[in-house]
Amino acid sequence: EMCIRDRCRFMNIILLSGGSGKRLWPLSNDVRSKQFIKLFKNEKGEYESMVQRVYRQITKVDPEAKVTIATSKSQASAIKNQLGENVSICVEPCRRDTFPAIALAANYLHDVLDVKEDEPVVVCPVDPYVEDTYYEAVKELAELAQAGNAGLTLMGIEPTYPSEKYGYIIPKDGDNVSAVKEFKEKPDTETAKKYLAQNALWNAGIFAFKLGYLIDKAHSMIDYKDYQDMFDRYDQMTKISFDYAVVEKEPSIQVLRYSGDWKDVGTWTVSY
């Protein structure tokens, strides 16, 4: 059994790399992206890149995690170079924003990796600088998706200050897992303070669903047969974000509150 009493044996994770997270694009050129520069010291005192750090943390929390990296053609060799030949890579033929990128990766999981439609999948950006507890929360997110009480499960980051950099998730209540009341665009500081008074969480672009949920969504919005067909016609796909195409229209949505340390390297204002 894949999951025994909602405890998942392993996670299916899609890591969005290669500029699907467009906030990173202005900071670095396409090929030598920020996420491959060895900036971070690990416990052994060795320098590692963002991609290496995230991959190491996931496999530490869940040694059997199945990680697929959705990326551009120009970054595929850098990823193999840093993570080894066995890493699973779904290559986007061209940039089409996050909904097509995630739809392509979901169909890749289904058709190429033989992931079943009732298995949970977690999507996260490759650029958070976090403690290992974050990936324990990601595992919990997979378990919530597996339990199937909502179509979509998001991770919301407990804000440390009224930031203008993030969209906000307003939950129905302050519980660890809550239904989502509404989403808010990036606010000014005064508005952000009002959100914080409503238990609001930062929307960090981390979400989970059963694979079949996204395959169905993709078929309802895109005319295609299977992964190969979508890949071949990818350049004809409409550019649309996952938030806009799926998240904001989903009536059945819940959020898991995460209160650990979290820094999003994609919004760092420092430059190296």
Where are these regions (language model features)?
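Short, small-residue-biased leader/transition segments that mark boundaries at the very start
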Residues: 1-4
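Conserved core of the sugar-phosphate nucleotidyltransferase
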Residues: 131-228, 233-234
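Residue-level signal for inorganic ion chemistry
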Residues: 51, 105, 127, 169, ...
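Active-site metal-binding loops of divalent metal-dependent hydrolases
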Residues: 20, 128
